[in-house]
């Protein structure tokens, strides 16, 4: 089965769907001030036609209500900054393209649009028709828009996904090179980590080269991804998956060869690795780059009627459900659907242990980029 056929969130609105389990979380809330600053710089740059129609794309938008929460933040930021900077001007139309792979459940977003538009009108005073949302399916490692046609490109929790499993893992190192893990975890051998870094470098370079061409000169990108900081990082969601899969092997419910032959196309770069790639590619300048921590259960709320002793387990089950909604399609394609309930039951146990220790944070990186002006524009 082709990777792009399974590289999507759980579809629909069922108990394990991304639409039901994903919600506005602390990580998105932390991104919003950076988003507003990025929009402020964008509006001050006086790009072509920006006072009439701002063209925006959300790359790797996923599906369900969470997608429109991100769109809401973008629209609110544009309106807020626009009022602060140019309050004498009429609000520009905002055209937003939602991008993800062809298998993404775009329909779960489209059917929410009528109520979303009404809410924008009621809460933000944006007349229906002044914000236009459409889909642009396809890999963001390929061309999506005409040259110099976009003002702002946004991507949240997407660029850590690679275009493919690093070829070096199989071609150069052999099928079982990454024993005991599904990605480039801290305990992986250096050649495995290098293979993943090489693939990320190739992919992120392609991403920057292609999409910088789609931006107007001095257009902006704002990218957020999971990252690594040092060897003392707390377990991230993929580490929890590693633990749960290894539990199934120890219990005899899964063959070790199944794990050794599977690698997920996911890489957590360091801030320095991202910085070096941007500088080497050369089409954009870094305006700011920061890291921050977000908690597994940042979006979780609980009724006070629950006994305190049950909070950790309930939170852990929430964490497991959220991780399942993101990773189940690609995991089920390799390990089989039948083992999924057992896998995520064990993941919830590991999440509970991590939460009990007062841990459960993962590192995030946010970077704001501006396309360098052409020499003729300087």
Swiss-Prot record:
Keyword annotations for this protein, in alphabetical order, are:
Alkaloid metabolism, Cytoplasm, Magnesium, Metal-binding, Methyltransferase, Transferase
Where is the protein found, in the record's own terms?
Cytoplasm
The pathway where this protein functions is: Alkaloid biosynthesis
Q: Tell me its cofactors.
A: Mg(2+)
According to UniProt, the tissues expressing it are described as: Mainly expressed, at low levels, in leaves and fruits (grains). Also present, at lower levels, in roots, stamens and pistils.
Q: Which Pfam families match?
A: Methyltransf_7
Q: Out of the domains of life, which is the source?
A: Eukaryota
Signal peptide bounds: none
Q: What class of enzyme is it?
A: transferase
Tell me the InterPro entries matching this sequence: MeTrfase_7 (IPR005299), MeTrfase_capping (IPR042086), SAM-dependent_MTases_sf (IPR029063)
Where, in this chain's numbering, is Mg(2+) bound?
Answer: 178, 260, 262-263
Q: Which residues bind S-adenosyl-L-homocysteine?
A: 18, 61, 66, 100-101, 139-140, 156
Q: Which GO terms describe its cellular component?
A: cytoplasm
Sites marked Involved in substrate discrimination: 154, 266, 337
Look up the EC number in the record and give it: 2.1.1.159
Query: What GO MF annotations does this protein's record show?
Result: metal ion binding; methyltransferase activity
**UniProt catalytic activity:** 7-methylxanthine + S-adenosyl-L-methionine = theobromine + S-adenosyl-L-homocysteine + H(+)
**Cofactor info, note text:** Binds 1 Mg(2+) ion per subunit.
Q: What family name appears in the similarity comment?
A: Belongs to the methyltransferase superfamily. Type-7 methyltransferase family.
Q: What does this protein do?
A: Involved in the biosynthesis of caffeine. Catalyzes the conversion of 7-methylxanthine (7mX) to theobromine and of paraxanthine to caffeine.
- Give the protein name, as stated in the record: 7-methylxanthine methyltransferase 1
The species this protein was found in = Coffea canephora (Robusta coffee)
Q: What is the lineage of its organism?
A: Eukaryota, Viridiplantae, Streptophyta, Embryophyta, Tracheophyta
Please name the gene that encodes this protein: MXMT1
